[in-house]
Every structure is written in C-alpha cells, then in structure tokens.
Amino acid sequence: MEIIPFGTNDIDNILAREPARAESLPFGAVLLDRMGRIAKYNKAEGLIAGRDPSTVIGRDFFNEIAPCAKGKRFHGEFLKFNRTGQANVMLDYKFNYKGAEVAVKIHLKSQPDGQFCWLFVKRA
C-alpha cells in the first residue's frame, strides 16, 4: 500500500474510497461534520494530542476538544466550510500542549459531498 503524503490534493477522494486508510496515515486525521462534531479521529492524531481516539467521537471539536483553536484563523477557515461545504486550505498553527508550544501544519480539506471536512495535522 502506498503512503499518502501530507498535503496530497486528492486525499479526500482516496479516503472516501478507502476510509480504513485514515488509520495508517503518518499524520493526524480528524473528520468533522459541518457542525464541528468529530466523526473520525485516527491514532496518529491521538498521539499528537495525547487523547484516546475512542473518547472523542461525536464530541464538538472546537468547544470540547480543542477550544484553543476557537476564534483563530484555523477556526475561521472551518466556519467557511460550515457555510459553503467547501475547504482546501493549508496553514501553520501553534497550540499549547502540557505547557509547551507545539507547531503544526494544518490541512483542511472537504469531502466531495460537502458534508464532512478532513482536518489533517502534521508536526512542523
């Protein structure tokens, strides 16, 4: 199985065809619905964020899981997806984890149906 690199333009189509591949990605992957609820949270993201993936499914990403991201550019890009169903943006982001600032690259990419958006996270 080929490795899917971070930032791959058609990653949404690959994961739509083969959803199980999200678990083998070498970077974090979170699937959010248009309201920001978590539908999928892979193991790599669990390691980056220090969370058990099974405990976050169905929870509000911006209010319960990553409130530090609310009100920032990252959240603003998600709100555009909420309104339009479209997203494909990469940005640099820093979050505080256990008292240390962690730099990551974020790729927000909507699924073709416009109902879900992938949030890919890679340590910078």
Curated annotation (Swiss-Prot):
Post-translational modification: The 4-hydroxycinnamic acid (p-coumaric acid) chromophore is covalently bound via a thioester linkage.
InterPro entries documented for this protein: PAS-like_dom_sf, PAS_fold, PYP
GO molecular function: photoreceptor activity
Source organism, top-level taxon: Bacteria
Pfam families: PAS
Boundaries of every PAS domain copy: 22-85
An individual GO BP term: regulation of DNA-templated transcription
Record key words, sorted: Chromophore, Photoreceptor protein, Receptor, Sensory transduction
Positions carrying S-(4-hydroxycinnamyl)cysteine: C68
Keyword Disulfide bond: no
Family (UniProt): Belongs to the photoactive yellow protein family.
Function: This photoactive protein is a photoreceptor with kinetics similar to that of rhodopsin.
Protein name as it appears in the record: Photoactive yellow protein
Annotated source species: Rhodobacter capsulatus (strain ATCC BAA-309 / NBRC 16581 / SB1003)
